Amino acid sequence: MDIYQILVTYNKPWSTNEKIAFGLLLLTIAIILLFALYWKKLSKRQVIASFLLAVFLSIVFESTIFTRVVSTRKYELIPFWSWKAIYQYHDWELLKEDLLNCILLMPVGILLPFIVNNEFSWKKALAVGVSISLVIECSQLIFMRGLFEWDDIIHNGFGCMLACLCTNRLIRKYKKD
């Protein structure tokens, strides 16, 4: 399955109710962030980064949970099972899926240092990525909308952490120049 097919398969069109809920959620977040800016609790950069994070996470949750078709409860509880299958069976589609899972939460890792307006530790970034992924995976299991697997949680957390490390390094380099 190529990236386009993955996007088409897992990103079904949103219903009217989903669009309204998404819009109301973002409007509420925007109002709260604007008040925080007005009261000088957050800088413009922090407000923009926080709003971008809210938009991104809304889209991620929508595409990984809410727009998926209900099936049966599926789970894979063996960590790194996908890497074993990739190595053993040369399953390149599974490798692509693992890499895409690493990429999925990279935008979160990029935004974290801007939200806190400072460097964000890699341990905290890993914890944030794992936490977000755990919510996604548990929701998929509870609502029967996908496969719960530890590999996704590990890959998502790793991607978030890696992106945060790179962003911290770029910010440090930019501040030196």
Say what each PLM segment does.
Residues M1-R145, W150, C164-D177:
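Bulky hydrophobic segments
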